[in-house]
Design a protein with these regions (language model features):
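N-terminal secretory signal peptides
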Residues: 1-22, 29-36, 44-46
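C-terminal segment of N-terminal export signals and the immediately downstream linker at the start
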Residues: 17, 39-78
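Extracytoplasmic "Venus flytrap"
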Residues: 63-104, 124-135, 160-161, 243-251, ...
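Extracytoplasmic ligand/sensor domains, especially the bilobed periplasmic-binding protein
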Residues: 64, 68, 153-271, 324, ...
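Beta-alpha junction/loop-to-helix N-cap segments that form part of ligand/metal-binding clefts
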Residues: 68, 94-99, 112-200, 216, ...
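Periplasmic-binding protein-like
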Residues: 84, 147-160, 178-183, 241-244, ...
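Extracellular/periplasmic periplasmic-binding protein-like sensory domains
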Residues: 310-387, 445-456
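Segments of small-molecule ligand-sensing domains
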Residues: 370-383, 392-451
């Protein structure tokens, strides 16, 4: 958007044709930073109060993030490069694309500058069309090596899939570079959980013996436990069948659900991995139905054919058998893929869905308004964490004020009291996990994922 069109927008604001909030949202959606929007308003004679981001409902760096970190748009020290790596292909295109848009929005809100450096960003795609957009190990390794060999690169924002993180973390760790994820939830990346993580985890991912990895979303030991407690205690489900897509993430969260459901007193009639490349699950569902479960839990991501699993489940079992899945299914692609079979499905998520953020209002609601205007559709649930991940990185660069991987990593690990778009604050623990434990429960209603309530273990 040109400065001339901004002036037109300001004129509409003064004439009453456009409200101040709409002006801020439209200008931000066009890619202008908070500073440029404020400058344009002041140049047009709008008061300083009206020009402030808070007055317009725009969530700038000042309204979220760790306290006491000053921001400057000076770029005299040179350039810092930021990379991300997650799927941007096939069924994952919308999910990954929404996260990239959130990263770019956060960068724009900081004026594409931090700590005296100009910021550049490159989004890498670790997905492959042949795998329905799912990540590929060779690409993940190539991306990690590309990043550590770029002298301007200070931080890698990666990955979406926990299995991909297993590959990238050791490469970044050996190079002493920070890696931060907006979506990894497998516990074993940061901590050992009895019965749910592999032998040697997480230490085997950190060859230097020092931590370099963080995540801003709650891990699956929290999500799986909350899911089991809700199913058993609140829904009265006593007999579960547990499926997973045989990925690190899917098997991990399904195992936590299984273990916690049994600890509650529930019966697990069976637990197995399904073939994500199969074209039909009728025989599987017929065999499961014969065991008379009252709930089927499916640990999977959308690119691993869970929509077909649900369709075939519904063709064999009635609606009285509850379907429950984790955050890997909390996206429009899953609902669209399953079609009518998705109605009534329950899905958990480590946070709040976009509809809940809008209901809460404040910076989170404004974020949803802005990113929706940018995308032309409601964002993927995880996209909000893409924004927060970026703010963590930018504030660390501000604190370090040097082009130094070690100092930026140290600053990131010390993030505390971070004001979240979800409301409240969170801090990183010594393992690099967020101490936030918000788990949201959603239900598919009329083809849309609708927030129901917050749950806990």
């Amino acid at each position: 958007m040109s400065h001339e069109s901004i002036a037109d927008l300001v004129a509409k604001l003064h004439s009453g044709k456009v409200g101040r909030r709409e002006f801020m949202v439209r200008a931000a959606a066009a890619g202008l930073s908070v500073g440029l929007i404020g400058n344009a308003l002041r140049a047009a004679g709008v008061s300083a109060q009206d020009a402030s981001p808070a007055a317009g409902g725009l969530p700038p760096a000042a309204t979220i993030g760790a306290p006491g970190i000053a921001h400057t748009t000076d770029t005299s020290k040179g350039t810092i490069k930021l990379y991300s790596s997650w799927p941007l292909t096939g069924s994952m295109q919308g999910i990954g694309g929404d996260a990239v848009a959130s990263v770019k929005m956060a960068l724009a809100d900081f004026g594409n500058a931090a700590g005296g450096f100009a910021l550049e960003y490159e989004a890498l795609d670790d997905g492959v069309a042949a795998n329905n957009g799912g990540w590929e190990a060779g690409k993940e390794s190539d991306h990690a090596n590309k990043v550590i060999n770029d002298a301007d690169a200070m931080v890698h924002m990666a990955t979406y899939n926990s299995g991909a993180a297993k590959i990238a973390i050791p490469i970044l760790n050996a190079a002493g570079m920070a890696m931060i994820s907006y979506a990894n939830t497998y516990p074993g990346l940061t901590k050992a959980v009895e019965g749910a993580t592999e032998e040697g985890e997480p230490d085997k991912y950190y060859p230097t013996g020092k931590r370099n990895y963080m995540r801003v979303c709650p891990a699956d030991d929290i999500q799986g436990g909350a899911s089991a407690a809700w199913a058993y205690d609140e829904m009265g489900k006593k007999a579960a069948y547990v499926l997973d897509d045989q990925s690190l993430y899917g098997h991990g969260v399904a195992t936590v659900f299984k273990n916690q459901f049994e600890k509650k007193g529930g019966t697990v009639l069976g637990a197995e991995g399904y073939d994500a490349k199969a074209s039909d699950y009728q025989a599987l569902m017929t065999s499961i139905a014969a065991k008379n479960p009252d709930i089927v839990y499916v640990g999977a991501t959308v690119d691993q054919n869970p929509a077909k699993v649900l369709q075939d489940m519904r063709s064999v079992m009635g609606d009285e058998v509850l379907f429950l899945g984790p955050d890997g299914l909390n996206n429009a692609a899953f609902v669209q893929g399953a079609g009518e079979a998705a109605e009534g499905a329950y899905i958990t998520f480590g946070g709040y869905t976009p509809d809940k953020l809008k209901e809460l209002g404040g910076p989170g609601g404004d974020y949803v308004d802005r990113i929706t205007a940018t995308l032309g559709h409601a964002p993927d649930a995880y996209a909000v964490y893409g924004y927060e991940t970026t703010v963590v990185v930018l504030q660390a660069i501000e604190k370090a004020a040097e082009k130094d991987r070690a100092k930026i990593l140290e600053a990131m690990l010390k993030t505390e009291g971070f004001k979240s778009l979800l409301g409240g604050t969170w801090s990183f623990t010594e393992t690099g996990d967020t101490d936030s434990s918000i788990i949201g429960l959603a239900k598919v209603e009329n083809g849309e994922i609708k927030f129901q309530k917050a749950i806990s273990g």
